Amino acid sequence: MKPLAIPANHGVMGQQEKHSLPADFTKLHLTDSLHPQVTHVSSSHSGCSITSDSGSSSLSDIYQATESEAGDMDLSGLPETAVDSEDDDDEEDIERASDPLMSRDIVRDCLEKDPIDRTDDDIEQLLEFMHQLPAFANMTMSVRRELCAVMVFAVVERAGTIVLNDGEELDSWSVILNGSVEVTYPDGKAEILCMGNSFGVSPTMDKEYMKGVMRTKVDDCQFVCIAQQDYCRILNQVEKNMQKVEEEGEIVMVKEHRELDRTGTRKGHIVIKGTSERLTMHLVEEHSVVDPTFIEDFLLTYRTFLSSPMEVGKKLLEWFNDPSLRDKVTRVVLLWVNNHFNDFEGDPAMTRFLEEFENNLEREKMGGHLRLLNIACAAKAKRRLMTLTKPSREAPLPFILLGGSEKGFGIFVDSVDSGSKATEAGLKRGDQILEVNGQNFENIQLSKAMEILRNNTHLSITVKTNLFVFKELLTRLSEEKRNGAPHLPKIGDIKKASRYSIPDLAVDVEQVIGLEKVNKKSKANTVGGRNKLKKILDKTRISILPQKPYNDIGIGQSQDDSIVGLRQTKHIPTALPVSGTLSSSNPDLLQSHHRILDFSATPDLPDQVLRVFKADQQSRYIMISKDTTAKEVVIQAIREFAVTATPDQYSLCEVSVTPEGVIKQRRLPDQLSKLADRIQLSGRYYLKNNMETETLCSDEDAQELLRESQISLLQLSTVEVATQLSMRNFELFRNIEPTEYIDDLFKLRSKTSCANLKRFEEVINQETFWVASEILRETNQLKRMKIIKHFIKIALHCRECKNFNSMFAIISGLNLAPVARLRTTWEKLPNKYEKLFQDLQDLFDPSRNMAKYRNVLNSQNLQPPIIPLFPVIKKDLTFLHEGNDSKVDGLVNFEKLRMIAKEIRHVGRMASVNMDPALMFRTRKKKWRSLGSLSQGSTNATVLDVAQTGGHKKRVRRSSFLNAKKLYEDAQMARKVKQYLSNLELEMDEESLQTLSLQCEPATNTLPKNPGDKKPVKSETSPVAPRAGSQQKAQSLPQPQQQPPPAHKINQGLQVPAVSLYPSRKKVPVKDLPPFGINSPQALKKILSLSEEGSLERHKKQAEDTISNASSQLSSPPTSPQSSPRKGYTLAPSGTVDNFSDSGHSEISSRSSIVSNSSFDSVPVSLHDERRQRHSVSIVETNLGMGRMERRTMIEPDQYSLGSYAPMSEGRGLYATATVISSPSTEELSQDQGDRASLDAADSGRGSWTSCSSGSHDNIQTIQHQRSWETLPFGHTHFDYSGDPAGLWASSSHMDQIMFSDHSTKYNRQNQSRESLEQAQSRASWASSTGYWGEDSEGDTGTIKRRGGKDVSIEAESSSLTSVTTEETKPVPMPAHIAVASSTTKGLIARKEGRYREPPPTPPGYIGIPITDFPEGHSHPARKPPDYNVALQRSRMVARSSDTAGPSSVQQPHGHPTSSRPVNKPQWHKPNESDPRLAPYQSQGFSTEEDEDEQVSAV
C-alpha cells in the first residue's frame, strides 16, 4: 500500500533563495495562496477560495458555480427597531434572499469529457473529488492523478439491472460514485457495495473472472471505470517514480517524482514517507518546487511521531553551528515561533531553547534575524492573567518597572526577584503590563502605575511578553544616558514617516513601536479598526499621528495574528507603507513593519457614547474613546451640563439595581477606562457632586432601570443578535490553535487539552438548544410563531455574516422534534418565511458530502472572516486520519500528515482577517440604519455602498454630523444582546423539551376538531409491523363484511416476504470484490452500454407528451436526471420515487435518488405481482409521474404550477389502481394542498437535511414510508367509481388533492423509532466526528448501517398510522381531505396543511381507464391526455361537486362500510362537518390499525 499524496502547496517560501534571509515579511508568509485585500461584496457573490493549494477546488465543486442571488440578501429594508415587525420587512429584499441556488455540476462535466479532452484543471477537479473516496485511500497523488486522467464515466439507470454475470471476464477496475450494487454468490450469500467501494481487476494483466452476479440495487448508479491495461500500467509505474534513500542497508526515506502539470515546469521529488530522524533532517535540506510546505507541515505534525519537541530543538541548535545550515535553521525557528508559539509558551524546556537560540543569534551578529524573532514572539504571545497579593500596602513590589507614557512606551517589567511570588506566578523580564485591577496600563505614566501597584494589596495583573518593544525601550534608555537628554522626535518627522494607506494594509495589527508621542493625550487606541466616524473626523481635524491600521487589542485576541505569516492572515502584500524612523542595525528588514507592536501610538478617537445623568435625571450623551478615563468623562460632562464648578468637585458614579431591587452606588476611580463596556443594562453613570449627599437614583427610576434590563428575544434586533453570535463564534474559532486539531484528531495529550477547540465544538449544541428552549418556553402561540420568524431572520443574517456554524445551529434547533411538531404554530408562519427557511435548509443539504454548503464555502469571492460548519471540518479531518495509515512499511506516512496539515491550513485561512472582530461582521449589515454607528464603520465604506446593495439605487442620505443619541441606542442594543446571550438558560434535555412541547400543543390538538376543517384523517394500512399494542388494536378493528377482488389480490401480495432494508455495511477488501466484465460487444463498454440503452429511451420519452400509462409503466426507464438535458422532467424509472435533485443539478456521489435508498431487492414480474409487492413492502414501485411532481413542487413550493399537470398525465393510470399505504410517522394530508404541494423530500438532502450520510438513510424512513402512502391514498377502492372506467384525470386530481403533505418529510423530524437517524442526530453532539458526522461517511450510499448495535427501525415507537380504508373494505367515498392523526404524543406533525388552494375539479368530458382494464404493453386509445389549455379552461368554469352528486356510500356508525351504488363518475367530495362517513374515525380517535397479517414490516 502506498501512502496518500496531495497536490503540493506552492508558497512564497518555495521560490526564494534558501540561504538568504527574506528581505521583508512577505517572504515570511508561507501561504498556500495569496489573498487580496479584503473587499466586501455581497455574500452571494463572495467567497474566499478555500481550495486546495494546487489550485484545485474541493469536493464542493460538484455544485460549483455561483449562488446566483441566493446569498445577496440585501436586507437593507429591515429597519432597526426594538422589534423587527413583519410589516417593516422589505419584501423585495427578503425575496431576493430566498432565490434558489443555481449551480452546475463541474465534476460531472469533467467526467463526461473524453479522457483525451480533459485539461489539467479538469483532472484537478476530479482529483479533489476522488480523494474523498475509500477506493483511492493509500494511493499516492501521482497514481490518483493518472487514474483521473483515464477514467471513463458510466451510468446504469435502473435498479435490478445485471451489471456482471457469474463467470464473466473482467476488463476494468471500477469505483462506485453513486448508488449501490449487490453481488449474489453462487452459494446464496450476498454482498453490498456502496459509494466509494471499488471492484474489478487487480493490477495484473492476467485474465480474471467475475464471481457471482452483480445487480444494481438502486436507480442511477454511477461508476468510473479504468481499463485493465491502464490500471495495470499506472499502478506498476509507481515503483519507477519512487526514489528510496537508504542508510546502512535500510530504507529511511521514500520520495516520489511528481509532475504537477503537463508543462513539465512543476516537477520534482516529494517526501512520501520516512523515519522520524530522516524527516527531521529534511528540514534543513533542499526542498523541491513540488514540496514547498514541508517545513510548515512538519512543524504542525511532528507531534504525531515525536515524543518531545526538544528532539527537534536539540538538532536545530546543533545544526546552527554549521555556517552552511545557519540560515535554514533560523528560518525553521522563525516559522516555528510564528506558526506554533504555543509550543514554547508554558514549556520551560522550549523557552530555554528559545533563549539559547537568541543568544546564538546575538553571538553571530545576526541582528536582523534576532529582530524578526522578537517581533514574532511579541506578535504571537498571548495575554496572561496573574494574581499577586501583598501582605500590606507598604510591602515592596517584587519587581522593577521601566517605561511609561512619558517615554512613549508602555509599562515593562525590567527584573523580577527570584523566588518571589511574582516569579512563581510566571512574571518575567520583558513582560508588558497591560492592565491592573481593571485599569488600563497601556498608556500610563510610570509614577501613576507605581502608585496604583503600591496602593493595592490584591493585584490582578494582565501581562504579555513583548521583548521587541522592551529591547527598544532599553536602547532608548541607554541613548538617553549617553546623550544626557531624552529624545523627542519632531512632529514633522512623525507625519512624514508614518503615512498609512489603509487599503494597502493587510495586517490586523497596530503600528509597531510608537516611539513618538506628542503628549499623553496620544493614547493607545485599542478599540480597533477604522470606521465611519473616523472618516468624518479626518475631514475636520489634522491628524498629528498616523492613522491606525486595523487591530484587535482588548477584544480578547491580541494583535498577533498577522505579523509574520500567521495562521489566519496568510498574506501580507508587498505594498505595505513604509513608516520606519527606528534606528536599527539592519533597518531594511523592518522598513514596513517596525511599527507593528506599538500599543500606545494612536490618537484618541471618540467612537463610543456614554449617557451621563445628573441627580435631577437630566442626561447628556458624551462621545468617548475606549481609553477615555472617568476623570475625562467628568470634565466633558461638566461642559455638557454647563456646570460652573471645577472638575475636582465632581466625580463619576455608577448606580446599578440588583434583580432584587437593591440600589447600589459606587464612585469610579479617576483612571478607570473602557467605561462604555463596563456599564450594565441595569446601571447608569451619574455626575455626582462630591460635596453633596443627594440621592442619585430614586426608587421609581430604579424600577424603570430594572424593567429595561429585563430582555426578551423579540425585543432584540435580529441583525444585532446575528452580529453578536458571529463575533462570539469567531473569537472562539480564531483562538483555536492549529495544533489543537492535531491533538484532538490523534488523541494526543497537550497542555491546553484542546480547550479552544472544545469550546467551539460546544457552541453548536448550545445554540441549537437555545433555539428550542426559547420557542418552547413561550406559551402564547402567536408569540411562538414570532420567535420562530425571529430565528429565521437571525439565521438569514448569520449567513450574511458568513457564520455558517450559528446558521446551522439555528436551523437544527427549528428542526428539533419538539419544535417541528408544533403544527399550529408553524401554520401561522407567513409564506415568505417558510420559503426563507426552506432555502436556508437547502444550503445544508447533506447529499454528496454537503456539496451545496461546500460549494458556497469555496465560491471564489467569499472572503474571510468565515465561520465554517465545525462538524464538517471534523468529519473531513477524521476521514483523512482514519482512511489512511499513519505508518507504512515501518515508516512515517508523511503524505497523510501533509494532507491533514493542508486541510488545517485551509480552515485557518477562514479566520484570516485584517480588522477588529467587533467590526468585521458589522460591515455586512449594509445600510441597516439611516445613520450607522461607528461600530458599523469600515474603511471600505464606499466599496460597501456599491458592492453590498445589489444594485439597489435607493440610498438614505447620511448625516454629516454625529448623532450621539443614535450611536448610544445602537450600543445599547448591542449591550442588550450581549447580556441576553450571556444570561441564557438552556434546556439541553430533549425529554424536557418534549414535555414543554406537549404543554404548548398537546398531542390531542393534532386531531381534527371536525371533518371539514382541513385536518387530516387517519389511514389504517401501515407499511410496518406494529408493536404488540398496535396489533391488538388492529385485531379489534371492525372487519369489513365483504371484500372486493382487488383486496384479495392485495392480500395475496401480503404473503410476499418483507425485504430487509438494512444490508450489511461491512467494507470488503478490494481483492475480494467482483468487477466489470468484457462480455459486452466492446471491451469496457458493459456498463456504458447499459447507460446508453436508457439514454435512448429517455430521449424518445421526452418527445412523447402523450405517452400512455401502461407503456410508460412497463417501458424501460429514462436515463438519469443527471444526464443532459439536465432540467428535463423525464419520467422516473420503474421502481423510483424520485430521482431528481432539488435544484436541477445532477448528482454524482454520495446520493442516489430516493429510491436508491429505498428500493427493494425483489424484481417485479407482472403488473399485479408488482402491485401486490408494492403493497406488501409499502413502496411505490411504479409511480412514474411521481418524480416529476416531487421535483416540481420542491423547486417551486409556492407554485404547484398548472404545467405540472402535463407531465403528470403520463403516469395517471398508475394512481388509479394504487393502494393505500400509511406512514409510520404522524404525517398529515390536507384538502387543499394539491396546487402547492411542497414535496421537499424528493431529494435526500431535503428530506433529511441534517443527515450527513451520503445515502441520507433517513429518507428511507421518511420518504419511502411517508411518501408511499401519500402518493397512493386513492385507489379504485377509494373513489366512487368502479364500473365505468373512471377518469384518469379524476384520479390525478384526487392525487393532487390528497397525495402530498406539505413539508411532510422536511418537518417530519421524528420518526418514532428512538434509534432513528433524526433522533440520533438530535441527541448526539453535532460535532461528533465518529458518530453523527463520521459514521455516515461517503462510502456507504444506499444502505443503512446499524447504529449502536441496533438496526435503525422504521417501526413506529408508539404506533403506526393507519389508513381510513383498506383494500379489504368496501369502496367508500373517500373525503378529499384525508387526514392523519397521531395516536402518539411524540410524533412530528407535518405543518401548513391548511393553507394551500384546492386543485381544479376534474375537467368534464374526460374519462380515465384503470390500468388493469387492458393488457400490459398496450396503450388504450382513449388515454390521450387532455389538451392542457382546454382542460385548464374547463376546470375553471366547472363548479365543484359536493356530496350531493349522486348517492354515496354511507359509513355505518360502527365502522362497517356498505356500498350503496356503483361509481360511474369521479366526484370531488367535500363532506360537511357532520359527514356521517367520518363518524367512526372520529369516535375511534383514528388509533386503530389493520390486522397484523396485513402488516408487512419493511425492516
Curated annotation (Swiss-Prot):
Residues 717-944 form the Ras-GEF domain. Expressed in primary neuronal and endocrine cells (at protein level). Highest expression levels in brain. Lower expression levels in heart, kidney, lung, placenta and blood leukocytes. Keywords: Cell junction, Cell membrane, Cytoplasm, Developmental protein, Differentiation, Endosome, Epilepsy, GTPase activation, Guanine-nucleotide releasing factor, Membrane, Neurogenesis, Phosphoprotein, Ubl conjugation. GO terms for cellular component: apical plasma membrane; bicellular tight junction; cell-cell junction; cytoplasm; cytosol; endocytic vesicle; late endosome; membrane. Pfam families: PDZ (PF00595), RA (PF00788), RasGEF (PF00617), RasGEF_N (PF00618). One of its GO terms (biological process) is brain-derived neurotrophic factor receptor signaling pathway. The modification Phosphothreonine is found at residue 644. The modification Phosphoserine is found at residues 501, 806, 930, 933, 1022, 1080, 1089, 1095, 1116, 1120, 1159, 1176. Residues 606-692 form the Ras-associating domain. Gene3D superfamilies: 2.30.42.10, Jelly Rolls, Phosphatidylinositol 3-kinase Catalytic Subunit, Chain A, domain 1, Ras guanine-nucleotide exchange factors catalytic domain, Son of sevenless (SoS) protein Chain: S domain 1. Residues 385-470 form the PDZ domain. The Ras-associating domain is necessary for the Rap guanine nucleotide exchange activity. The N-terminal regionis necessary for cAMP-binding. The PDZ domain is necessary for its targeting to the cell membrane. Interacts with CDH1, CTNNB1 and TJP1. Interacts (via C-terminal domain) with MAGI2 (via PDZ and WW domains); the interaction occurs before or after NGF stimulation. Interacts with KIDINS220 and NTRK1; the interactions occur after NGF stimulation. Found in a complex, at least composed of KIDINS220, MAGI2, NTRK1 and RAPGEF2; the complex is mainly formed at late endosomes in a neuronal growth factor (NGF)-dependent manner. Belongs to the RAPGEF2 family. This is Rap guanine nucleotide exchange factor 2. It comes from Homo sapiens (Human). The lineage of its organism: Eukaryota, Metazoa, Chordata, Craniata, Vertebrata.
